Amino acid sequence: MTPPPASPSKKAKSSWLLIALIAVIIGIILCAGVITFLTLFNKNGDGPDMDWQNATEVPLTTTSKATVSTTTTQSATTPSTTTTRIEETTTTTSGAFDESVKNSEASTSTIPTTEAVPTTTATDAPEIVMPVDVASILKDKTKDFEIVEKCAEIQALPVSCTPSQSPLTSDPSKFQPIHYVLNITIRDVRKPVLEGHMQLFASTKDQVQAISLHSVKIHNLENRDRIHVVNCNTGETICVSRVHQIDDLIHLELAQSISSGVNLRVDIDGFISADSGPHVFKQIPTAKWRVPQMIGSVFEPTSARHVFPSFDLHNQKSTFNLCLNHGPSMSAIANSLINPNVSTSGISCFEKTVPLIAQQLSFVAFEKTNPLFYNTTTMDGAYLPEIDMIFNLNAKNFKQYEWIHSEVSKVMALMSKWSGFSYPLTRLEIVVAPVQAGHSALGVITLPAQAIAYQKHTSTHETLIKEVIGQWMEGVVTTEHTCFEKALIAYVEWKINEELQIVKKTRKMEVSKIRPRNLNETADSVRVLRQIKSQSSNLCSPRFVEVFYTLDETYGQETVIGMIRVIFDKFAFSTATISDWASAAETATGGRPEAGALIHQWYRPSSTISRPVLRAVVSSNSVEFNQLTEETWTVPLEISGSAGTQLAVISEKKQAIPFVSSDYVVVDAGRKSHAFVVYDADTYLRLIRCFGDSRCPSKEIGGIFSDLGAALLANILPKPENQDVAKWKSVFKFMAQQNIVEGTAACCVEHAIREMRKCSYWDIQDVCTKIDFNIVLAAVA
């Protein structure tokens, strides 16, 4: 009997089973291939399972919109905590980086860095700037630290002696401070009254018989029983025979002469500062104004001497150990972290600082305030420290202040990159306080509360940027010439704003604002530079900023950045001179000596007209320059014409530069130079035609005529020859018609051509009639 044929349903089922079996086999083969590939991939150390903890390089993960988890807490002195998440564009590293940061603080070994791998875009990945090894940089200070430790153990013995017949004096510049152990007690916040005692370790740089310290209105110093001097080299206690004050110096007369190179310890007990004025800020809560009580320092040059006796010169750096007795209701911050092993309730003692000048010492005591705290992270490859923000208000809306952290982080990342020197501390304190102007001391930034309240104001962001720059340009490297320091900070702020567009302005725009309309006058120095009128007897001129613009525009946009890198490589935690910066300028420009001369001459004491003014006479085959000022300057200038642009260096009183052009010739056509250039009458007449000509090598002819007005007011122009009077009147008539100059300059231009439409009687009588150039022109009908 034949079996019946299989049913159609069973055939279909067998087909599906066969297909499934084939699919499983193919899947197994594919899985085996993937596993084999991943195994080989990981052996090369490039796969996602790479052992980051044992890697020889720090792996980077770059994201266009990375989420940084940031803990926002009250400081250790307050119990409550809140947490917020902040979205930032940042370059993050793995946890291995955080571990390397901790290791760098405990070891002097350097941290291996990686070169960023270029992305598929045209922009290269950011340069990696790792935390600096502070211990390695300060290794040459080890001997000083040993001197302090040994000398601190020497007991000062009671000694007696008779005063000399005539008072003896010395000078603070004959000493180099090594270390301060400073204890300050806040006796009264309202006045304020500060009491203190200190140990000062210093070495002599010359033979002396008196120790001279800066001290202004500090009481209890006249009692010599409160002062002891120890010779650290011999262990001997040196008798202080007399203490007397002359002007801003307290002189401690010694019973014996001390030779150069001797290490001394000066103990001063119970001094009182009751007149610290603008050098210490305070905030007192009232029934209507419920704010945290605060008191803190905002030291400008010569401020420290109002609070404690000190060597208060700009080139006298030393380390500090500060203890602040503020009472149990308050907390405190300073340049360095609190030392928990020494601090107690009501007394905050801080770790030893890196070397600082006296004006860089900073402390703030406060109560009942709400801080914001941000953990260590990175941005664009740069290390960012912990950032602790303290406010003078009991604010509850944390997010309204997050922009401060965002801007600070961006500027710190850029400063790390430009200087090649990462922020050297583990924490930055930012204090919003009732102060007149911003202040920067290494580790502490103090911001004016009134400015921070108005985030949309341009000056608010300018202040913040300058104070962050000050962490590097004043804190890490100090320059003896304070005006150089302030001017460089102002210029770097302009460059940073061009880069980050925090404030929409350009360097060219800012230089144009401060370029004088009268060579005998300058712009508002307080607006441009970071300084306080009430605290500065000699304000710095804004003209000091211009030289950096000249360097960048003449020799390349990386010139000033190159100078900064050279200085930070050589002078971190020490003081640089103008000569050091001049040498750095020469190095940054590839060995051009005129760049160094530019720095030297720009910061030398000058006559009334403190910039180069040159008269250019254009002929068919050359341009002849005559310097019109008393001083001779070295001036790099571009000469532009039909054949192109040529860079010339003018270094003599009278100098001819070969130059041929078939049409117009313009010196400094791009307005790059800090120098003023005036011309002969024939050249000005040609420049009038150049004014609207597309072939003109300069688009800023108006500025050239404006400079003529400034030179006219300064009475520096040579008297015109009789045959040129008509030409000059044509030039001045053009200036008046085009309204190129304004104010007194416009009046004197009109006076020269007898068309005084806008002139006041006093301008004519007091200024215009006394200008030699005008006397000649006005005398001719």
Swiss-Prot record:
Q: Which InterPro entries match?
A: Aminopeptidase_N-like_N, Aminopeptidase_N-like_N_sf, Peptidase_M1_aminopeptidases, Peptidase_M4/M1_CTD_sf
Gene Ontology cellular-component terms listed? cytoplasm; extracellular space; membrane
User: In the UniProt record, does the keyword Signal occur?
Assistant: yes
Residues in the signal sequence: 1-27
Which keywords does UniProt give here? Answer: Glycoprotein, Signal
Residues annotated as region Disordered? 63-113
**Transmembrane residue ranges:** none
Q: Where is the composition biased (Low complexity)?
A: 63-94
The residues that carry sugar chains are N54, N183, N341, N375, N520
Whether Glycoprotein counts among this entry's keywords is yes
Its recorded name reads Matrix non-peptidase homolog 1
